[in-house]
A protein has these predicted regions:
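Alpha-helical solenoid repeat scaffolds of the TPR/TPR-like class and their adjacent stem/linker regions
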Residues: 1-180
Length: 180
């Protein structure tokens, strides 16, 4: 079952079992040759293990399979050392204007363009793309600032000095920090 293999590969990757994880990813790709999520995961694995050239190849394989796979461009940008080619920038610029490209993919693409233009020292274009990415991301976010403020105010109302004084004897008495 490829879903079980994907889950196991992810667990192995997160626990430094890179070799075993890579073997599982490759076995999945034998069955699903165009699975962009697996190539993306392989790219992340290579990045984490320090093999940046293979990470770049894996990320590029994603957009060779699906040119609209925005996470591949964002992952390249997130390497911090990758420089987009003029052709990649041109293609990304066209795709973010395409009404058929999903909002989520455009978010990734705008972030990638932000980094690409920043590297070119075209700071206005960089800012514009970062701004658009953040705007689109905010529109799709479930986070509501007012809800956060209301929650904080509610905690202030409930967690009074009186509440804590009634619970003064509770808990552990050591002043040592607890790391969770």
């Amino acid at each position: 079952n490829s879903n079980a293999k994907k889950a196991l590969a992810t667990c192995l990757f997160r626990t430094d079992g890179y070799k075993e994880s890579l073997e599982l990813y490759d076995s999945i790709l034998e069955e699903e040759k165009n699975n962009t999520d697996i190539y993306l995961s392989k790219g992340h694995l290579y990045k984490t293990s320090g093999d940046i050239d293979k990470a770049i190849s894996s990320y590029k394989k994603c957009y060779e399979i699906d040119r609209y796979f925005g996470d591949s461009y964002w992952s390249l940008a997130n390497l911090k050392t990758y420089k987009f080619t003029d052709k990649e920038i041109k293609n990304l610029t066209k795709m973010v204007l395409d009404e058929n490209v999903s909002k989520n993919e455009k978010i990734f693409m705008h972030f990638a363009l932000g980094k690409a233009f920043e590297d070119l020292k075209d700071y206005q274009s960089s800012f514009n793309n970062y701004h658009l990415a953040n705007k689109l991301k905010k529109e799709s976010s479930l986070f509501k600032y007012q809800d956060y403020i209301d929650d904080c105010n509610n905690q202030k109302t409930v967690c009074t000095k009186d509440l804590f004084s009634t619970k003064n004897e509770w808990g552990f008495t050591s002043d040592e920090p607890i790391f969770i």
